[in-house]
């Protein structure tokens, strides 16, 4: 009877550990996506900064992917098209675009910190379960 109870406890423990492991993997993927978004915003901020001194008619190379570029000429150096999501963009001044990107970065950093906090809690609980599982090995 005690052996059956032990087996049930072990099965339950293993199921919990697998659930926590799955949750950790999902949280890590979420953290990676948030970090990629932060990197994207940083690239946009860097691009805005590098274009500030450029005037109308300034020529530059624009990346199109796969390490390829096209030649382009700046038509409106004081305006930036800012993506809002769902394939919707709005035209903003460079200063307004910078504020939008900085606000996005702040929100993304907050989301990343929250995600990492939950990830740490889940990792702690998983570690506790692993220590509990070690008791059954002895």
Curated annotation (Swiss-Prot):
InterPro entries hit by this protein: PFD_alpha_archaea, Prefoldin, Prefoldin_subunit_alpha
Keywords annotated in UniProt: Chaperone, Cytoplasm
UniProt entry tagged with the keyword Cytoplasm: yes
GO cellular component: cytoplasm; prefoldin complex
GO MF, one example: unfolded protein binding
GO biological process: protein folding
Domain of life: Archaea
Subcellular localization, as worded in the UniProt entry: Cytoplasm
Family of the protein in this entry: Belongs to the prefoldin subunit alpha family.
UniProt subunit comment: Heterohexamer of two alpha and four beta subunits.
Function field: Molecular chaperone capable of stabilizing a range of proteins. Seems to fulfill an ATP-independent, HSP70-like function in archaeal de novo protein folding.
Protein name, as recorded: Prefoldin subunit alpha
Native source species: Methanocella arvoryzae (strain DSM 22066 / NBRC 105507 / MRE50)
Taxonomic classification: Archaea, Methanobacteriati, Methanobacteriota, Stenosarchaea group, Methanomicrobia
UniProt gene name: pfdA
